[in-house]
Amino acid sequence: GAPSKFIVADMPFMSYHVSVEDSLRNAGRIMKETGVNAVKLEGGREFCAVVKALTAASIPVMGHLGLTPQSVHKLGGYSVQGREEDKRKRLVEDALMLQDAGAFSITLEKVPASLAKEISEKLTIPTIGIGAGNGCDGQVLVINDLLGLDSGFHPKFVKKYADLYSVSKEALETYNREVKDRSFPSKDYSYE
């Protein structure tokens, strides 16, 4: 575990979509079985009743607005959310509604920096940005992206702080070569 860290678990797809009762049961199970400190769910006003029920049951809830990966196909792909005025307005309203429902924080993903800043200034709870500019109260990146653990596509907002993919690939190739030529394990790594 990580006793000095605050850990938030994503509620899996469809674990909070069917009913408030199912959502309570599923969130409670996640909290008990994983030992996390809070749960996060994607979506706005349509899930405010769930947020209210969970927080009433002492389950801390983080909201998630903008690009919501669990419903990416409904959104038309991995595009920036909230560029059009009506969608921008709806995201602001959804953020305020989630706050009023009891969310302790909201993740804003892949929205214009100006929108994230506007939402952050209107809320009294912290915002965490991922592809939302520097106007949020905090930032998050996927650890595999941050560490450069793969060589594939990376969204514009991802900054690779290391290239562990290349380091790992080189280490595995060296290991493979040494096993094949029998230079590993040498005496230093063997028992007599």
Language-model-detected regions and their locations in the chain:
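Alpha/beta enzyme core
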Residues: 1-162, 166-192
